A protein has these predicted regions:
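Preference for the N-terminal adenyl/adenosyl cofactor-binding alpha/beta module
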Residues: 1-220
Length: 220
């Protein structure tokens, strides 16, 4: 195992994820000092935010995020969210490489950067998912341009329902779901890095030390 290459991977991954999370916080109305430019407003059975109608679920998660930023700091919340997505997506990759899970993040093809988790759902093969999420997903699947939204809902559901992921890391905080980077599926995003990295060799995935080394390098 080449730890120098693992360090390069972890460093690059952290930079990509932190940039994505910070951008997401900005899109949700948070300034670098933790103050907000706008808050969602409840209306009837839902809410509005930045001129758009949003769900009660979004409103509740945004308020939870605002509370976390106020109680701690925006920098700490951003770090937590980036690492949450790092460790879970890396763990999923390790499970797949060891035959403990079906392919999730791998692409349907190199010409179309759509993860198999999404393409399978588009073909009617859904992961375990609660009724409310299934209703939202069914609406999203009517529009192939909403790949990011489809992936966000599916990967959150996958993490909640996978017993190994839950045993290792626990459940994802509700507000962390809002901070999944919107560029995570783009060319150069974190999923792209996972699928194309040369820093992690095939034999590395079979080593029980891999996740420990990546954690150490990520936080260093």
């Amino acid at each position: 195992m080449d730890t120098n290459r693992l360090k390069r991977f972890a460093t690059e991954a952290r930079n990509i994820l932190m940039q994505g999370v910070v951008h997401r916080l900005s899109a949700l109305g948070f300034l670098p000092d933790g103050s907000v430019t706008e808050e969602p407003q409840q209306q009837g059975g839902g809410a509005t935010f930045m001129g758009d109608t949003v769900t009660q679920d979004f409103y509740d998660k945004w308020q939870s995020l605002h509370h976390a930023v106020t109680e701690r700091s925006i920098a700490e919340v951003a770090e937590e969210a980036a690492y949450t997505w790092f460790n879970r997506l890396v763990a999923i990759r390790i499970l797949v490489k060891n035959g403990l899970a079906s392919p999730v993040l791998e692409y349907e093809s190199e010409d179309v950067l759509v993860p198999l988790l999404v393409s399978e759902a588009r073909q009617g093969r859904m992961p375990e998912i609660d009724a409310d999420s299934m209703r939202k997903l069914t609406e999203l699947l009517d529009d192939d341009s909403k790949t990011n939204e489809q992936f966000a809902l599916l990967i959150v559901a996958y993490c909640h329902e996978n017993p190994i992921i839950n045993k290792c890391f626990g459940r994802i905080s509700d507000y962390t779901e809002l901070l999944l980077p919107t560029n995570i599926l783009t060319d150069g995003g974190f999923v792209y890095l996972l699928n194309h990295t040369e820093f992690i060799a095939e034999e590395d995935y079979r080593s029980p030390e891999l996740i420990g080394w990546l954690y150490q390098f990520y936080i260093s």
